[in-house]
Amino acid sequence: MTQQTRLVPTPGALNGVRVVEMGQLIAGPFCGKTLGEFGADVVKIEAPGAGDPLRNWRLIKNGTSVWWQVQSRNKRSVALDLRQQEGQDLSLIHI
């Protein structure tokens, strides 16, 4: 008996669900990553400039934190200044 390998993964339990992640450092990004692993479309909002502090936190490899590489997978990121009206308006239109 042979096993068949699926070339196309099956959709996750959260396929079709959009999540807006606004957290920083560990807890928020971890939750967003986990939801993305279950198929959610995760959009991370970061402040313009430095972005999430996790990008530069410990264990820098090739200019990027290993923590960031792990916690940012399965996501799309957008830089918006939510302190400004324009950033707030864009977040409602595009997300």
Describe each PLM feature range.
Residues M1-I93:
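N-terminal helix-loop segment corresponding to the beta1-alpha1 unit
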